[in-house]
Amino acid sequence: MTTTDTDIAATRNITKTRNRQAIIRHLATHGNVTKRQLQLDLQLSLPTITGNIRALEHDGIIAPGPLTDSTGGRKSQSYRFNPSHRTAIGVTMHRNTLRLCAIDLQGRPIATLSRTLPYANTNAYYQRMGSAINDFAAEIEKAHGPVLGVSFAIPGAISADGTVITFNDSTGATGVTIDTIAQSVRYPRQLIREAAAIAMTETLHDAAISDAICLYLNRRPSGALIMNGRLHRGPNLCDGAIEHMTLIPGGKPCHCGRRGCMAAYCSPENLPEDYESIPGFFSVLEQGETHHRERMNDWLDHVALAIANVRCVICADVVIGGEAALYLDHDNIADLQRRVTALSVFGTDHFTLRLSRSDENSGAIGAAMQFTDPYMDALWRPCR
């Protein structure tokens, strides 16, 4: 074969791939579409459309949709993208609970499992967890497509290569590797910071998000960044982890061993008085009790300072989630935004601060998206 023939063959293959990707992308974004509509929208020949539809349906990537009315009187077959032809599983491990969530390629949960399983850094725990994951995955594959992999959302920090938990004081898993955690899991596996995983789901709930600082005000606060509509992790897999930014030099001790961290001041654990719970604090706050209002003001000031500091570097919108967010109403959020604005020299003309739409499954869903997002990118990424 001459060089010219090789070039022609390569060009034809690229064209075929582009046509296939264009059809997949159109069906995934427009729902049920007929061949005729694909022909009109994509400006492709009917034989090209028909051949691709046949191949994609054979591969399970698309499926027949409902019959639709046509001008000729005979109903036309429509086609749709099949988001469950591949699946992925996300896992969260906390002190007493193991949570699994399987998602399709569009990030929708297709099955969940929550089990009481007290964490222990032992092979017995990891093997028991692995057995639960393998059984769960087998059930998913019976009803849907193959599982691409299993991703673990970890509170704390992970190594730059994504294989080791480098800090986790909530379960004591610091230093544990992915090989230990997933020692009996029969699928590809990954680690991700839980805050980063939850942030990934923010883009599912709000497709308009472009740049955002995600701040999760749990008892152990954490953060993550969304840039250009996607999670931004950076080369060290810790971008957005603002919880250990120094807020007050030489201030309160933090659980990381340093002093003055944002986490030490912005945790909702700072709100209750002795022997009072966090829900109890907000219940009394609603009644207008003076000392509770003072504590709330101090806490909001510290949260606002943390946000204003971060926005000096990344002038983005802000999403507030976590346990504390469950008790914050519209007035609290508006108040917090005013405090941030008052602390900011510039960058508040176009600035939105809102509550997260995450829920108890968001960490697992976002973790699973580590497998589904790259698969979808490869499925319809334009050729270069």
Question: Which positions does each model-derived feature cover?
Answer:
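Glycine/GP-enriched mid-protein hinge/lid loop-to-helix segment characteristic of carbohydrate kinases
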Residues: 112-114, 121, 183-291
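Adenine-nucleotide phosphate-binding core of ATP-dependent small-molecule kinases
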Residues: 124-141, 265, 270-329, 355-356, ...
